[in-house]
């Protein structure tokens, strides 16, 4: 039973969705272009081959014979049944889902099985507040960026904490349109365009895998001769690696300017 006012983060509206827990971003090449190719091919082949109960296995074998299996973390499953749900390629999702197959639920054929796939709720549902959920789903319209951001709890909570402190209230989600939406979108787009992103192959957000367990890749402030930055959590979420104190300062400036611009614009718009 869903609570009143429940916000479905997986499929929030007709313009985007998330497929992160199906392994979407765990491919060695998880650039937008590469994922679009992957999902587009799968969707086409699924529609061509899957007509009856056992066909998904034929589909699976075909996909495995043509796709690169290289992953960031071998321990995280990347499900081949993730594809596009709509012709416009705005929503990613499960090709085995009953809504995609005239009511027939084929998820039992998957690695996790129907029960796990249908019942999974990721930590973002619990830790991201209702206001933050409503705001973020207004700010980000595109599936690729949306999935990266909605699963990054620290990034979301830190940004809203900084702007809330500056405007002395929780920003009202209705305000995320026009210029305010653009400024917030600029911030969340750093998830893709951050200039100080580490190139280490085994990094994902703040985590890296040391061969046996997931560890947080902390920033070595001592080495940079710097105090721990107030934006430390944001830096970690952005997979940062700073080689010099100047790079660290530049990173702080990018974040500071965005937050201050948002605060100023929010206050000015409120007066007008
Ligand atoms: S990571 Fe969370 S929001 Fe994304 S599809 Fe999975 S459960 Fe849904
Ligand atoms: S079968 Fe499960 S893991 Fe695979 S795409 Fe569907 S919901 Fe995701």
Annotated model-derived regions:
Residues 34-69:
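Charged, glycine/proline-rich intrinsically disordered loops and linkers
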Residues 1-20, 26-29, 43, 60-272:
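Short loop/turn segments that flank or connect secondary-structure elements
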């Amino acid at each position: 039973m869903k609570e009143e006012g429940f916000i479905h983060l997986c499929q929030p509206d007709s313009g985007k969705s998330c497929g992160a827990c199906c392994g979407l971003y765990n491919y060695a090449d998880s650039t937008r272009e590469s994922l679009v190719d992957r999902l587009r091919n799968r969707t086409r082949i699924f529609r061509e081959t899957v007509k009856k109960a056992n066909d998904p296995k034929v589909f699976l074998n075909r996909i495995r014979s043509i796709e690169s299996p290289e992953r960031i973390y071998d321990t995280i499953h990347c499900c081949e049944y993730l594809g596009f749900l709509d012709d416009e390629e705005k929503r990613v999702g499960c090709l085995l889902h009953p809504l995609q197959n005239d009511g027939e639920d084929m998820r039992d054929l998957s690695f996790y099985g129907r029960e796990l796939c249908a019942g999974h709720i990721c930590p973002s549902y619990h830790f991201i507040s209702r206001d933050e959920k409503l705001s973020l789903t207004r700010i980000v319209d595109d599936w690729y960026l949306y999935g990266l951001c909605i699963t990054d709890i620290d990034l979301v909570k830190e940004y809203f904490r900084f702007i809330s402190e500056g405007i002395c209230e929780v920003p009202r989600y209705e305000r995320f349109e026009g210029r305010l939406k653009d400024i917030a979108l600029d911030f969340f787009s750093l998830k893709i365009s951050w200039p100080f992103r580490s190139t280490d192959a085994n990094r994902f957000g703040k985590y890296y895998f040391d061969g046996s367990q997931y560890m947080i890749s902390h920033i070595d402030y001592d080495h940079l001769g710097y105090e721990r930055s107030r934006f430390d959590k944001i830096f970690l979420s952005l997979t940062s690696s700073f080689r010099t104190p100047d790079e660290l300062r530049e990173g702080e400036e990018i974040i500071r300017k965005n937050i201050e611009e948002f605060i100023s614009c929010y206050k000015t718009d409120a007066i007008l």
